[in-house]
Amino acid sequence: MINSAVNLLVNPQDYYIKSESREDLPQINLFKLVGNLGYHAMMLEVHLTPKPGLVDLCTNGAHDDMDIHTFENSAQAINPFLIKFLYAGLNHSDTPIDSLLPKLRPVGLNAEEAMFQATSGINTHKGMIFSLGIVCGVIGWLRGNNLSFDAMHISKAVKCCCHDLVFKELRQNHDKPKTYGEFLYKEHGLTGARGEAASGLATVMDHGLPAFEKTVKEGFSTEQALWQSLLVLMANNLDTNLVSRGGMEGLLYAQQAAQGLLVKGGCRYTNLESELTELDEIFTEKKLSPGGSADLLAITWLLAQMNELSPKYV
């Protein structure tokens, strides 16, 4: 069940600003709207219920240190920074896209600080800040260059922006890994969120987004489309969150469990909710949390909105 307070049908006119500022009002309106949609993406992900091993409206999943309120507080703290990512991209749109990432990092660090302050030190959305920050920054850059900001253009721009991220942050420290992400790369070749960004959000573009848009086009609800997309993402994503908690065996188990529900019909399966609830109990017992796929689910929904929004502004 998705919280009804999360309004999916955002009207751009709701963000009209009356101002004597010389700034481009349509630009301000657009960035406020995109930032708002980024916030909605975070809220939709956490409110989707049930989910296996993840915090939702009914359970804390495999997490002992956080609940739905922790996530809501975190999302609210991050929200103001999304428009800052957008303007960081816009303000550096006269520079090559492959030089954008360092300009986004300060905003990301400030967003992380706000998140930790809101959650008393609990990491709820660090991966989400990374992914949403890059996507929003790229949208700002594309807008500054009068380019479309649909999913395809965002994907290509993210790939150019982050093309050497794996080399700079994972391969260079291959022999002496300093972080757990570097260790997972050395031991298993897993690149996590960095690899997803460097690939141009390939898992989202190849799996999550097509599943979401196809399901919506077939007449299913947003909630059902989100379930379908989450299962497709879980079945295909090399989720380092799962590996950190359950090793490669945990990742394989989660992938097979998601694939099993897809074989039964996914969102078309009449017992999906009850089986997701049962799977949540199993994941919780095994301490498995597909947090990487949860982040990609939010990105999937946001890119679907950009496909609808971009033609109205370009």
From Swiss-Prot:
Domain of life, per lineage: Bacteria
EC number(s) from the headed UniProt entry: 2.4.2.52
InterPro entries assigned: CitG (IPR002736), TriPribosyl-deP-CoA_syn_CitG (IPR017551)
Keyword Ribonucleoprotein: no
GO molecular function terms noted in the UniProt entry: ATP binding; triphosphoribosyl-dephospho-CoA synthase activity
Keyword Transferase among record annotations: yes
EC class: transferase
Pfam families (UniProt xref): CitG (PF01874)
One of the GO BP terms on file: prosthetic group biosynthetic process
Record key words, sorted: ATP-binding, Nucleotide-binding, Transferase
Catalytic activity: 3'-dephospho-CoA + ATP = 2'-(5''-triphospho-alpha-D-ribosyl)-3'-dephospho-CoA + adenine
Similarity comment: Belongs to the CitG/MdcB family.
Name the UniProt record assigns to this protein: Probable 2-(5''-triphosphoribosyl)-3'-dephosphocoenzyme-A synthase
